[in-house]
């Protein structure tokens, strides 16, 4: 069949509307990453979906770090039945465009969702962000499984910390993140505050084993986290 019968143009991009899980999403036909996977299969990362469904409760404050085009943001909002707050943090402006369209498409109550065009790390400032030809593989790290998909282009993006964002929007009860290896820096930055009792969120993240090495090692960070009761 001809996809041209089913797609529309949004922001000069070919966008395809597809049922995903129990909601709908606009997906970028030129993206061979998350959009392509959802067009083909209508779902992804079932293990994380199951974790979120079991852990998330109404009235929670969620930090969705690496919110991308909204696959999890919509899911989180529906699980909480619009009775909670989601801080959706995403450094790519292209992804944010689709994220906003997808929230509108699903009639999500956007007053309960804050979208921040930024990355998250262990410092506040700016950092070089390497762009990939798949919308879910942009990264701070040039090595690892994302390397073959990097375009050679980069942009400088704003960087915030979880603690910095918490002071503006409240402490997170639940953190979901998919940050292409940068979970090392983010979790490490939380350890001190968790130890002090400032916060103790549920943390759900996708590990990126190929992005770890002796100088960028998740193991000691997780060991420290486990000592704090995780």
Predicted regions and their residues:
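Phosphate/nucleotide-binding beta-alpha loop and adjacent structural elements of enzyme active sites
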Residues: 1-230
């Amino acid at each position: 069949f001809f996809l041209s019968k089913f797609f529309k143009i949004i922001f000069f991009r070919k966008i395809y509307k597809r049922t995903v899980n129990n909601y709908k999403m606009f997906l970028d036909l030129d993206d061979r990453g998350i959009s392509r996977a959802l067009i083909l299969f209508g779902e992804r990362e079932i293990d994380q979906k199951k974790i979120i469904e079991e852990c998330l409760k109404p009235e929670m404050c969620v930090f969705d770090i690496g919110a991308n085009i909204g696959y999890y943001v919509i899911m989180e909002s529906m699980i909480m039945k619009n009775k909670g707050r989601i801080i959706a943090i995403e450094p790519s402006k292209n992804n944010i465009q689709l994220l906003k369209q997808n929230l509108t498409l699903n009639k999500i109550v956007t007053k309960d969702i804050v979208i921040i065009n930024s990355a998250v790390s262990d410092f506040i400032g700016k950092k070089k962000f390497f762009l990939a030809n798949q919308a879910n593989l942009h990264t701070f790290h040039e090595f690892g499984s994302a390397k073959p998909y990097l375009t050679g282009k980069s942009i400088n993006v704003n960087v915030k910390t979880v603690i910095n964002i918490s002071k503006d929007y409240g402490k997170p009860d639940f953190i979901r993140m998919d940050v292409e290896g940068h979970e090392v820096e983010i979790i490490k930055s939380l350890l001190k505050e968790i130890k002090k009792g400032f916060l103790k969120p549920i943390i759900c993240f996708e590990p990126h084993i190929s992005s770890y090495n002796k100088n960028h090692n998740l193991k000691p960070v997780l060991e420290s986290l486990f000592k704090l009761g995780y």
